Amino acid sequence: MPHPYWEHRDWYDVHDNTSIAGPDREPEHYREFVITLPPIGPGDHVVDVGAGTGKLAGLVADAYPDLGGVTLIEPNEGKLDRARSRLAARLGPERVRPVRATLGEGGSLPAGEATLAIVGSVLMPVLLGRGGTPRDGRAWVVRVLAEIRSLLRPGGWLFDVETVAMPWDVGADDGPGRRLTLLELTAALEAAGWDLVECVYRFRDRVVVRAQRPPSS
């Protein structure tokens, strides 16, 4: 299980990027994420899945201040309140909707509303914290990715920022839990019903993966 310190929103703000991406790579990783995004305007609605304290959504709002709105999905109440405050300061409270929820648990989520879903170093850390085997982990990731797909309008895009396992870290399916490799992550996206899956940025184990909800789905 994750250390309880991660539940403290200020401690999380100080430590999350250093722990996940590393202080040397984090600025480039997140800058490249913003560069890979399509143009975002008043007709777009962004959903930040596992929003934490709103850092990733804040980068999007800074780059595209005219975006139509943001939904923040986060299970931790303190972090969600911090994220809401951050985004409201940039966009105004009327364009920010906080939703306290955990993906992968079959909860009630705002389906079919967003044009763009963003995920910032969420899936792999949660996967490690859940424990279980790699087989269990892949099944959970597919389930979560299917839920994220349901948040989007047909034709909407997902951009997922992750730190993945390297190919030589792969072990037995019934071995200790671990991060997915890039190939396993793209396979999970396809299994969850996504189209046009593509890695649009990679530096060693840092990746940004893009995928589309099929326009006809």
Descriptions of predicted regions:
Residues 1-39, 43-52:
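Conserved class I S-adenosyl-L-methionine
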Residues 55-105:
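Class I SAM-dependent methyltransferase SAM/SAH-binding core
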Residues 107-117:
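A short acidic, Gly/Pro-enriched loop at the edge of an enzyme's catalytic core
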Residues 115-139:
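A short SAM/SAH-binding and catalytic strip from SAM-dependent methyltransferases
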Residues 136-154:
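A short glycine-rich, Lys/Arg-flanked "PGG" loop and its adjoining helix->strand segment in the class I
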Residues 155-162:
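Conserved beta-strand signature within the Rossmann-like core of class I S-adenosyl-L-methionine
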Residues 194-217:
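Core SAM-dependent methyltransferase catalytic element
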